[in-house]
Design a protein with these regions (language model features):
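Extracellular/periplasmic catalytic domains that process cell-envelope and extracellular macromolecules
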Residues: 36-37, 123, 186-187, 327-333
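Second-shell loop/turn segments in exported
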Residues: 42-48, 125-126, 269-280, 338-344
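Basic-flanked hydrophobic alpha-helices used for secretion and membrane insertion
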Residues: 40, 55-56, 60-62, 77-222
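Sec-dependent N-terminal signal peptides of Gram-positive bacterial secreted proteins and lipoproteins
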Residues: 5-21
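Active-site-adjacent loop/helix surface patches within enzyme catalytic domains
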Residues: 292-332
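Active-site acidic/histidine clusters and adjacent loop/turn architecture
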Residues: 240-305
Length: 386
């Protein structure tokens, strides 16, 4: 039993995970890039979706016992209804009952200077929203503009843009606000705890392990190695595969604006799996992967029956495997596909899909073994010579 207990402690401490999470975010905090946090040893703790309240309280208890420091990062997808420029003119307006979706991070004002410059910290503390460069380009956002946002609580708020910064500075979130503004937007959830101290020792990990009852956590310390099945953050998904307005349907399923859907989504017959509906950009890498599966004699390891009954590619919905804060599934872009929904994949099939630019969900913190997600078009370009 002692050996088994030691094994769980080591697993808890050293488990690694994708730098880019499934709903498109990375942890800037892991990089320890900005003024302040790089002067400390840092532990980050997260779990699929949202940190449970019990986990949050047990982290607080541990940090108190250790006399260390902790802050919590929040995140949710918020609706963008319109943009009002500095001349009080609407520079962007959505269709009736439709919204764009933004992935917004929240941070405690008093700790913002650990991660951001003094200028950005001051703007965050003044209740401004900091927007990433790709997002600003996507929606023609300028400093001083007012974003009209519809929160998770369905309350409409107007927030001024304080600054536009490189996406990496925001950890590939589309925007960041302080916790108070986040609460106004209905973002009451935390996705990550950041613990820091002058020196982290094994006592920190023992204390955390002793107090936190839920063990399916992602814990990183120092330089975490990225999982090979990392995925694109939302800003890059929009840049490479397009963006669309959404209309709520039932909390999970959404309605994608018809103009985008008609221009980007189509139905075709594919080898092995038969008829499917995907983003047009998917056809070349998907066809390449399926053809190679056949060339290597592995076609019988993929189940057309499972795919046709409960698998699929295009599915306009939010992520529903865990509390993902309203994050839009990559299936809504038609760039993810679930084939063997029950029987799993042959390891070589996973390798083939990786080679054709797909990430596989089987190694994520919350495994999604049936899921392949397109993240890179360069393999299909180089292998087809087009």
């Amino acid at each position: 039993m002692k050996k088994l207990g030691l094994f769980f402690i080591l697993l808890f401490v050293f488990i690694q995970s994708p730098v880019l999470a499934h709903d498109g975010e990375s942890e800037l905090e892991n990089n320890k890039k900005f003024n302040g946090i790089e002067n400390y040893d840092v532990i980050t703790i997260s779990q699929p979706g949202v940190l449970y309240y019990s986990v949050t309280n047990q982290i607080l208890e541990s940090v108190n016992n250790l006399e260390s420091n902790v802050t919590f990062i929040g995140r949710a997808n918020i609706g963008l209804e319109k943009i009002i420029d500095t001349s009080n003119q609407e520079s962007l307006e959505t269709n009736e009952d439709y919204l764009y979706s933004l992935s917004i991070k929240t941070i405690e004002s008093k700790y913002a200077d650990l991660f951001y410059s003094n200028q950005i910290t001051e703007l965050i503390q003044k209740n401004k929203i900091i927007v990433s460069e790709f997002t600003a380009e996507q929606y023609s956002i300028n400093v001083g503009d007012t974003l009209v946002l519809v929160g998770m609580n369905e309350v409409t708020s107007e927030i001024e843009v304080g600054e536009i910064v490189p996406d990496a500075e925001l950890g590939w979130f589309e925007a960041v606000v302080n916790k108070e503004v986040g609460y106004q937007l209905g973002i009451n959830r935390n996705i990550q705890a950041i613990i820091w101290d002058n020196k982290v020792t094994e006592n920190h990990f023992v204390e955390l392990y002793k107090n936190i009852e839920y063990k399916q956590l992602r814990v990183t310390f120092k330089d975490a190695k990225p999982n090979k099945n990392w995925v694109l953050p939302t800003a890059l998904v929009k840049k490479y595969f397009g963006d669309f307005q959404i209309k709520e349907k039932d909390g999970t399923w959404i309605i994608v604006e018809p103009a985008w859907r008609n221009a980007n989504i189509e139905r075709k017959n594919m080898p092995i799996i038969g008829r499917t509906t995907c983003n047009k950009i998917m056809w070349e890498p998907l066809l390449g992967a399926l053809n190679q599966v056949m060339e290597e004699g592995l076609q019988n390891t993929l189940s057309k029956d499972e795919f046709q009954k409960s698998g699929g590619c295009y599915a306009p919905r939010r992520i529903n495997r865990f509390n993902a804060g309203g994050a839009i599934s990559r299936h809504a872009w038609g760039i993810a596909i679930d084939i063997n929904v029950k029987s799993g994949y042959h390891p070589r099939v996973v390798q083939i899909f990786n080679q054709w630019g797909f990430a596989w969900g089987g190694t994520w913190t919350s495994p999604d073994e049936m899921h392949f997600e397109l993240r890179d078009l360069s393999p299909s370009i180089s292998q087809t010579g087009s």
